[in-house]
């Protein structure tokens, strides 16, 4: 897609601290600046192993995924249904989600297409001056409807709506005034670096704000 605001917001939940232990995937599809679809899949991580702290965070347990598809099965569906149309992924603390995808691809020997990654967390730090930039706090502060935190589908939709608002507030995208604007995601002056500037998954920090 070359016109309008088009992207997929994506969120991964993991069963253990290992980035390749994905146990849930959520996506939210945005076409021309509108949320048109939100989906999530439970995923059986390798050997269906979970850590206590990860279960405490998202509430997903081994019995929830014992009959779920593996990550390669879920990724094949996402790739088949969406990736011919979309080449931009948005995530909140994108280095975390990007790392989950890349580690899983390495584990399962999957070929990944070229993806343009954008980060609603880093964008928030550039556009706003709120001090706290967790997904829950930003959505509450900006009046964005909140779902169940740390469930992949709800987090993906919250991220999508947040990113749309960030682009509006930054002036990079004006709905209706410029409907043929080349995809603003590619114009966003946010470039991700493979460094530790984000620290651990920011969605898990300052839980009181969530």
Describe the predicted segments one by one:
Residues 84, 107, 126-129, 165-169, ...:
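A structural signal for alpha-helix termini and helix-coil/disorder junctions
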Residues 1-2, 161-210:
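Acidic two-metal-ion nuclease catalytic site recognized across multiple nuclease folds
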Residues 12-14, 120, 159:
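Ser/Thr-centric signal marking residues that sit
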Residues 151-165:
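Acidic, divalent-metal-coordinating active-site segment for phosphoryl/phosphodiester hydrolysis
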């Amino acid at each position: 897609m070359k016109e309008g605001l088009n992207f997929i917001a994506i969120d991964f939940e993991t069963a253990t601290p290992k980035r390749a232990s994905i146990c849930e995937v959520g996506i939210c599809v945005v076409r021309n600046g509108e949320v048109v679809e939100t989906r999530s899949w439970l995923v059986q991580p390798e050997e269906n192993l979970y850590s206590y702290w990860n279960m405490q965070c998202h509430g997903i347990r081994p019995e929830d995924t014992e009959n779920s598809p593996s990550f390669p099965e879920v990724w094949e569906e996402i790739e088949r249904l969406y990736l011919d149309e979309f080449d931009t992924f948005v995530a909140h603390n994108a280095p975390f989600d990007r790392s989950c995808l890349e580690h899983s691809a390495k584990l399962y020997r999957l070929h990944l297409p070229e993806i343009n990654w954008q980060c609603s967390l880093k964008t928030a730090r550039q556009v706003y001056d709120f001090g706290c930039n967790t997904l829950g706090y930003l959505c509450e502060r900006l009046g964005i409807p909140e779902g169940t935190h740390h469930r992949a589908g709800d987090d993906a939709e919250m991220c999508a709506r947040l990113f749309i608002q960030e682009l509006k507030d930054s002036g990079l995208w004006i709905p209706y005034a410029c409907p043929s604007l080349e995809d603003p995601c590619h114009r966003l002056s946010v470039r991700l670096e493979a460094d530790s500037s984000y620290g651990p998954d920011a969605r898990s920090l300052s839980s009181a704000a969530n």
